């Protein structure tokens, strides 16, 4: 464990898995899916593995700038794990709650392959996801103490901010961590490809048009002129179940797309 004034690093290991197992055992949400350590509350809030995996499959590894994949509010780590294992990149998770951070680190360990050298650079930082300067320093220090001299940049940023519980609607500034400050804090640490940095935002599907416009304005303020694609994902029933924004290097040619998701794969894209 690497101590820092504002962050400390957890290096995924079998020891952390043992500690996590004392909190909650690893279970699969569905037959054939990976097992994860999650409390009931975490399981309720976590993105399903099938959706997380499909998102990773939509990204071409060659489109990503060089560097690690960062999840600045990682929670259980399911989406980050799907991205890092699918795209063969190291993962950096940041989680404010130390108890959740422990489970996230354990999940990174049990889903990784020992032969995959990328996994030796996986870390979970317990601390504030908006404090980019101290977070990246803590990450690099942890790598150095483990014998890795590299100072990898951030190749992709993922953010799924917490929203008010049981709220049918919420305001943009109620997201935690706050979207604007977080994007601004990490902007200078993101590697840039031909279409800009790679950022994936996972938002509430209940955002109305005005709220989506505020998100667009926040993105434009941080990354002027950057391309983005709004994705509306439905699992049936005539409703939108997931809303996300694919920014920069992972955007498509269209400003929006609708996806019909089956149990395990995309059924149609419009």
Predicted regions and their residues:
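S-adenosyl-L-methionine
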Residues: 1-65, 101-148
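Conserved SAM-binding loop of SAM-dependent methyltransferases across substrates and taxa
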Residues: 76-88
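Conserved SAM/SAH-binding beta-strand->alpha-helix loop
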Residues: 97-99
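Conserved SAM-binding motif I beta-strand of class I
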Residues: 90-95
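Conserved class I S-adenosyl-L-methionine
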Residues: 65-75
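Class I S-adenosyl-L-methionine
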Residues: 158-270
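Conserved acidic residues
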Residues: 67, 155, 197
